[in-house]
Design a protein with these regions (language model features):
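Short, basic (Lys/Arg/His-rich) helix/loop patches that form interaction surfaces
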Residues: 148, 233-243, 252, 300, ...
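C-terminal secondary-structure termini that scaffold catalytic or DNA-interacting sites
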Residues: 1-18, 79, 233, 237, ...
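Basic, Lys/Arg- and aromatic-enriched nucleic-acid-binding interface segment
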Residues: 149-187, 198, 202-262, 270, ...
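Active-site/catalytic core of tyrosine-dependent DNA strand-transfer enzymes
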Residues: 109, 152, 157, 162-168, ...
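Short, Lys/Arg-enriched alpha-helical recognition elements, typified by the DNA-recognition helix
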Residues: 66, 80-197, 209-211, 331-334, ...
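Short, polar N-cap/turn motifs at the start of nucleic acid-interacting alpha helices
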Residues: 266-273, 364, 383-406
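Short, Arg/Lys-rich segments that mark the N-terminal edge of DNA/RNA- and chromatin-recognition modules
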Residues: 1-56, 105, 155, 271-273, ...
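N-terminal DNA-binding module of tyrosine recombinases/phage integrases
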Residues: 29-137, 313-336, 340, 410, ...
C-alpha cells in the first residue's frame, strides 16, 4: 500500500512539473557562484552605442526579480538614455546657451571651479538613479568650504605656477561659498539638466525635486549722512575729477560700470539729462562695453548743482584737449585717465581707490554702497518706489527695489501719513492739543 502511494505521489510531482512553463532566464547568465543580469535600454543618442543596464545576484530567483525591475525601468522611461558624464553635458549646454559672453564666462567659472571637480566625471545615468541627493550634498559642502576640503589640511599657494613660497602661501582656512554663488551653481545645473531632458538624453530631471539654498534677505548698508559728507569732502580734496565721479555716483545711484562707460554724448547739460545706455565690464582680463545689466537704457534727471559740476568737469576736459591741439569729441569718455579722454578709466582701479579713501577715513564701506545711499535717501525723502526703481535701473517695475530696500519704506510711509493728516481738519478734541 505504501509503495503504491509513493508511486502515485511521484507521478503527480512529475506531471505538475511538466505543466509548469520553463523559467524565463533571458538576460541572465551564471558566472561562478553569481548570476549576472544585462538588459538593453536602447541606444545612446550621443554615441550611438547600445545602452545596457547591468546588475548581479546570488540566486536565480533574485536575478529574475532584478531583471524584471530593470525591464520595468526601461519600459517606464526612468533611466538615462546616455552614458555621457555631467561634465560633457555642461560643455554641450554652455556652448549653445544663448547668454551674454560675460554671463557665459561667469557660468564657466562656476562649472570649472565648483561643479566639475565634484560631479563632472559622474555619468548622467548614475545621477538620475541617485536623485537630488548628490546635488544637495554639493551645495552643503560648498556652504561649509568652497574648496570642499572635508577637514583636510593643506597649503594654499599664492599661484598655481612654479614659485618660491612666501608669507602669502599659508595653511588652508575654510571659507564658505556665498549663498548667491551656490544658487547660481544650482541654476547652471538646472539649465543643463533641463536641456538634457529636452534633447532626450534623460527622461527625468533629478533637480526637479532638489532644494536650492535659500537666499538671505538683502541687507544694504549705506553710509550715514555724516559718513557721506566725509566721503564727498575727501574726494573733492583729492582732485576735482575724482570728486566729480564720487558726486555723480551719490546723486544718480548708477552702477560703477555705467559711469565708467559714460560718454559725453550721453550727458545733455542743457536739458539736465543723463542717459545710461551701456556699461563697461571686465572679461578675460580685458574691458568691453555692453548693454546695461537689465538691457534697458534709462534717462536720469540731474539737479542744478550736478549740471554745474559736470559743466566744470567738461571745461577741464576741453582745456586738456586744447593743450594737445585737439577737440573733445562727444564720443569720448566722461571719466578718463587720458588727456584726450579717448581711454576709459579702469573700473577695478576706481574700486580700489575708493576703498583706500574710505579706509583712510575710518569708514567701513565700499563703492556699491553709494548706490544704496542714493536709493535709501530717495525713499526716506518720500520719492515713490517706481521713480526710485527707474533711476536705479531696476527691472520689474519696483519689485527688486521693494525687496532690497523694504526697511526704508517705513520712513516714507510716515511722511505720507503726516501729509494726508495735515490736509484734513482736526476734530475739536485735538485742535487745542496740537495748536
Amino acid at each position: 500500500m505504501s509503495i503504491r502511494l509513493s508511486i502515485n505521489a511521484l507521478y503527480a510531482a512529475v506531471m505538475a512539473r511538466r505543466k509548469q512553463p520553463p523559467k524565463d532566464l533571458t538576460g541572465i547568465r551564471q558566472r561562478g557562484g553569481t548570476y549576472q543580469i544585462r538588459v538593453s535600454a536602447g541606444y545612446d543618442p550621443v554615441t550611438g552605442r547600445q545602452l545596457m543596464l547591468s546588475d548581479s545576484a546570488d540566486t536565480e530567483d533574485a536575478a529574475v526579480l532584478i531583471r524584471d525591475r530593470l525591464r520595468e525601468q526601461v519600459r517606464d522611461n526612468t533611466t538615462a538614455r546616455t552614458n555621457v558624464t555631467l561634465g560633457y553635458l555642461l560643455d554641450e549646454w554652455l556652448s549653445g546657451h544663448q547668454v551674454e559672453e560675460t554671463t557665459r564666462d561667469s557660468y564657466r567659472l562656476l562649472i570649472n571651479g565648483f561643479i566639475r571637480p565634484a560631479l563632472g566625471n559622474t555619468p548622467l545615468a548614475q545621477l538620475c538613479r541617485q536623485g537630488p541627493r548628490p546635488f544637495e550634498q554639493l551645495y552643503a559642502e560648498l556652504r561649509t568650504c568652497r574648496r570642499r576640503c572635508h577637514g583636510r589640511a593643506f597649503v594654499e599657494h599664492r599661484t598655481p605656477r612654479p614659485h618660491t613660497c612666501d608669507e602669502r602661501c599659508a595653511g588652508h582656512v575654510c571659507k564658505p561659498l556665498a549663498v548667491s554663488s551656490v544658487r547660481q551653481c544650482h541654476a547652471v545645473l538646472s539649465g543643463a539638466l533641463s536641456a538634457a531632458k529636452r534633447w532626450g538624453w534623460i527622461t527625468l530631471n533629478p533637480l526637479d525635486a532638489a532644494q536650492r539654498p535659500r537666499m538671505p534677505a538683502p541687507q544694504p548698508d549705506p553710509p550715514s549722512a555724516e559718513e557721506a559728507a566725509k566721503i564727498a569732502n575727501a574726494a573733492w580734496e583729492q582732485d576735482a575729477d575724482w570728486g566729480t565721479f564720487v558726486w555723480l555716483t551719490f546723486v544718480t545711484g548708477a552702477r560703477r560700470g555705467e559711469l565708467v562707460g559714460l560718454a559725453w554724448e550721453h550727458a545733455d547739460l542743457v536739458s539736465g539729462l543723463l542717459t545710461i545706455r551701456r556699461s563697461l565690464v571686465r572679461r578675460n582680463g580685458t574691458t568691453i562695453l555692453k548693454d546695461t545689466k537689465t538691457h534697458q537704457m534709462r534717462v536720469i534727471k540731474l539737479d542744478q548743482d550736478t549740471i554745474m559740476i559736470l559743466s566744470q568737469h567738461r571745461e577741464r576736459a576741453e582745456q586738456r584737449c586744447a593743450d594737445l591741439d585737439t577737440t573733445l569729441d562727444d564720443d569720448t569718455f566722461v571719466f578718463s585717465y587720458a588727456p584726450d579722454h579717448r581711454r576709459h578709466c579702469d573700473p577695478d582701479a576706481i574700486t580700489h581707490r575708493y576703498a583706500k579713501m574710505a579706509a583712510d577715513l575710518g569708514i567701513d564701506t565700499h563703492l556699491h554702497a553709494l548706490r544704496h545711499y542714493s536709493a535709501t535717501e530717495l525713499l526716506a525723502g518720500g520719492v515713490d518706489l517706481r521713480t526710485v526703481a527707474g533711476r536705479l535701473g531696476h527691472a520689474g517695475g519696483g519689485a527688486t527695489t521693494l525687496k532690497v530696500y523694504a526697511a526704508w519704506l517705513a520712513g516714507a510711509d510716515t511722511k505720507a501719513a503726516d501729509l494726508i493728516a495735515s490736509r484734513l481738519p482736526r476734530p475739536p478734541s485735538v485742535r487745542g492739543e496740537r495748536s
